Amino acid sequence: MALFPDLVPELKAAMPQLRGRLLGNEPLAPLTWFRVGGPAQVLFTPADADDLGYFLAALPRDIDVTVVGVGSNLIVRDGGLPGVVIRLGGRGFGETGTDGDVVSAGSAALDKRVAEAAAAAGLGGLEFYHGIPGTIGGALRMNAGANGRETKDVLIDASAIARDGTLHRLSNAEMGFSYRHSGADPALIFTSARFRGEPMDRAAIRARMDEVQRHRETAQPVREKTGGSTFKNPPGHSAWKLIDAAGCRGLRVGGAQVSEMHCNFLINTGSATAQDIETLGDTVRARVKEHCGIELQWEIKRIGRALD
């Protein structure tokens, strides 16, 4: 049984020139790394940036819009998402390229692929992206970083489309970056970005990337259904150490568990619901607060509504 009224026929009729794909009541769980969550009332996959702009300009303003990438840092709640979920992908948003010391990437390009494109051109400084399991769109939105580097350290500018379909370009300063956060208008949908690399020896760059990958595979539960780092590191502290000290290593709620390998990762052991995972996260936060007085902040984005 469909959770939401079908908006697809109405939208198709209002947008005769649309080239992207519209699907109604489309399951989102297969599109997230946790493999949990309800459906999107409408899932739209635009053909390219022009198609996205056309769609947004024609979309009634009272319909909510949510953007998802590869779903690596995301919990979709079990009741799904009303309105339109936009998923960027394919050739229209996944391309990468280099020109001199500039690396360009579509917002659907995997962070890892951007690091590899830079390395192939002999450009360093972006190796940290090799260990981040997401896309450039997500990296822009949350100032993604690892190994002492962040998106703000390498970004030149980003292109985005507003809710009314207009195109915008934001400089690094206009992005309003802070720790795991961008102050850019939440309604903007990033479509591409440019980064500044540093000319370096290709072998040295590859060695750094290999080290990043080795660290990730030995220290993080990369083979599990997980959303990546769950909580932001509080100033002066490591979230995983606080979680471990509060006795939460291996803690379970339903089919969700705090990873034994890395305490700042929650995993779906196979039968978890989105509610299990979110409840586990909130339980961890409460125990850490009780143990040391520090309130952990979610790094994973949680969207949608609970199942009635």
Curated annotation (Swiss-Prot):
This is UDP-N-acetylenolpyruvoylglucosamine reductase. Its EC number is 1.3.1.98. Residues 211-226 have a biased composition (Basic and acidic residues). PROSITE patterns: FAD_PCMH (PS51387). Its main location: cytoplasm. The lineage of its organism: Bacteria, Pseudomonadati, Pseudomonadota, Alphaproteobacteria, Hyphomicrobiales. One of its GO terms (biological process) is regulation of cell shape. It comes from Rhodopseudomonas palustris (strain BisB18). Its cofactor is FAD. InterPro entries: FAD-bd_PCMH (IPR016166), FAD-bd_PCMH-like_sf (IPR036318), FAD-bd_PCMH_sub1 (IPR016167), FAD-bd_PCMH_sub2 (IPR016169), MurB (IPR003170), MurB_C (IPR011601), MurB_C_sf (IPR036635), Oxid_FAD_bind_N (IPR006094).
